[in-house]
Regions:
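Beta-strand elements of repeat-based all-beta scaffolds
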Residues: 1-7, 11-28, 32-72, 76-93, ...
Length: 380
């Protein structure tokens, strides 16, 4: 069993198992730990998980390994029904929200119905390819296939798009809804080498022996792409002049990217913590001749104890901070010590009230979970 895996950047994933060989703990590269609990010594399926935030989720299973219920960290329960073939026939969520599924004798999904009785139907050909989706309002989207099962024609909203293939099964011609054409050419290794678009513009692509793109041509613009020994993109040139550069640290993390704009070198530098999380971005503009620094702006990022991003600190501005709960649902934001917005949510974590400044936005939903209304009110 896999107990650890270390990536090129030195970050490690670790796993622990019980005496029965079941996964009981997993440590992510950023140090976050997820624990797994089992209530049956004969089952390989966990009855509960607990993540680094302390959020606990529970599951129940049938004796055939089918998920019967899932309870999230807020106590919200989703239940599942299955038929004798193991196919899911219904999903029951909180607030009376349910979805029902029907299948044909071949086990293909043929209908999905919501709580209000709105039904979406599906049709197939004899080979089992999906040929039509009929929405509750009766609108129909269809797909036609050739003898090899490749889509040759799709119709959506009354508009049709068609595809042609070569003997190797590659798309060589695409006809859009307005009758315009795009054509494609490939090399013997199935790599795209030429594309002529709807507007008649032709783009060509060249690859090295390992499949990396090394040259592209677009209406007189010739771009060369360059890589290091780790196959990371290091720079590209356009018509012989450097256009962009990428640099990395010893862990392989991107440290900066730069390009030339109106003669000035514009760069963005990135900083990370030991867990690989982005901690800072610094943008700079340098003089074209002297390389003197003309302008810079830095933004820092911070994380809470659970590893969730919770602060953004721009230069010369108060920090922007957001408050979350559970698995990261947004509860509010503030600028410095000034509240910007607060959210109230229902049991399904849907926004029901948004308070910002002197205003409140209330949101209501139908029994089927669809947006029903929104009202903006002034508190004055």
């Amino acid at each position: 069993q896999l107990t650890s895996a270390t990536g090129p950047d030195g970050l490690e994933i670790r796993r622990e198992y019980d005496e029965l060989g079941r996964l009981i703990q997993e440590t992510a590269p950023d140090g976050d730990i997820t624990r797994y609990r089992y209530d049956n010594p004969h089952s390989d399926l966990p009855c509960a998980t607990e993540d680094a935030t302390g959020s606990r989720k529970t599951m129940t299973w049938s004796r055939y390994g089918q998920l019967l219920s899932f309870t999230d960290c807020s106590g919200y329960v989703t239940r599942y029904d299955h038929d004798r073939f193991g196919q899911m026939t219904a999903v029951h969520r909180e607030e009376g929200l349910s979805q029902y599924r029907a299948y044909d004798s071949r086990g293909q999904l043929i209908a999905v119905k919501d709580t209000q009785g709105h039904e979406t139907r599906y049709e197939y050909n004899i080979a089992g390819d999906l040929t039509a989706v009929i929405a509750p309002d009766g609108s129909r989207n269809g797909t036609q296939y050739d003898a090899w099962g490749k889509a040759i024609c799709t119709t959506q909203g009354g508009l049709t798009r068609s595809m042609e293939y070569d003997a190797a099964g590659r798309v060589i011609r695409l006809t859009s809804e307005n009758g315009s054409h795009t054509t494609f050419r490939y090399d013997v290794l199935d790599r795209l080498i030429q594309e002529t678009g709807f507007d008649g513009r032709t783009q060509r692509y060249h690859h090295d022996l390992t499949g990396k793109l090394i040259r592209s041509e677009d209406e007189g613009l010739v771009t060369h792409w360059h890589y290091d020994e780790a196959d990371r993109l290091t720079h590209r040139t356009v018509n012989g002049e450097t256009a962009e550069r990428w640099r990395y640290d010893e862990r392989g993390w991107l440290t900066d990217i730069s390009h030339i704009s109106e003669g000035h070198r514009v760069a963005v530098y990135y900083g990370y913590d030991e867990k690989g999380r982005l901690t800072g971005e610094r943008q700079t503009v340098h003089h074209p001749q002297t390389e003197a620094l003309l302008w810079q702006h830095e933004t820092r990022h911070a994380y809470n104890a659970q590893g969730l991003a919770n602060r953004c600190i721009p230069d010369s501005l108060p920090a922007v901070e957001w408050l979350t709960y559970g698995s990261g649902y947004l509860a509010g934001m503030k600028l410095g010590d000034t509240p910007l917005v607060e959210y109230t949510r229902d049991r399904l974590h849907r926004e029901t009230l948004r308070s910002f400044g002197r205003y409140e936005l209330t949101t209501a939903y139908t029994p089927a979970g669809q947006l029903q209304s929104q009202h903006l009110n002034s508190l004055l």
